């Protein structure tokens, strides 16, 4: 049986609208549980301090607890891998640094493609790097 083009377009449009609105309905409930904020460096590092300074205001704004989770190692690759493997539901955030971008060139066999698998949400700081000498 052949479906007329016009009828097919109406069905396709209806299906697309239903899919879009089902995602919207799910998004209206976000967040309904704590959010995990993964940091790729040790406790006390600049990245950790930044995450811990942002977490309270982010928690207040979202109306849910934001848990800072330090996962240091392999230049940020361990933390990135944890986030990439998590559900893409917005409940697992990664504090990314320039190291994350460089890692693709530095390490062979990563289980992820940082550009493809991670989506930027917001810029949270700009930290200059300074070359110094003793005086």
Regions picked out by a protein language model, each given a short descriptive name:
Residues 114-116, 121-128:
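Short Pro/Gly-enriched coil loops immediately N-terminal to beta-strands
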Residues 69, 122, 134:
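Residue-level detector of conserved, well-ordered beta-strand and adjacent loop positions
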Residues 20-22:
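N-terminal signal peptide c-region/cleavage motif recognized by signal peptidases
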């Amino acid at each position: 049986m052949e479906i007329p083009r016009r009828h097919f377009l109406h069905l396709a449009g209806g299906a697309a609208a239903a899919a879009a609105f089902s995602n919207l309905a799910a998004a209206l409930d976000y967040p309904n549980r704590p959010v995990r904020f993964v940091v790729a460096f040790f406790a006390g590092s600049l990245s950790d301090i930044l995450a811990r300074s942002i977490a309270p205001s982010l928690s207040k704004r979202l109306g849910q607890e934001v848990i800072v989770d330090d996962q240091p190692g392999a230049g940020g690759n361990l933390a990135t891998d944890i986030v990439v493997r998590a559900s893409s539901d917005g409940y697992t955030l990664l504090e990314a640094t320039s190291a994350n971008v460089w890692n693709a060139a530095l390490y062979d066999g990563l289980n992820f493609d940082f550009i493809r698998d991670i989506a930027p949400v917001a810029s949270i700081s700009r930290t200059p790097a300074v070359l110094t000498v003793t005086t």
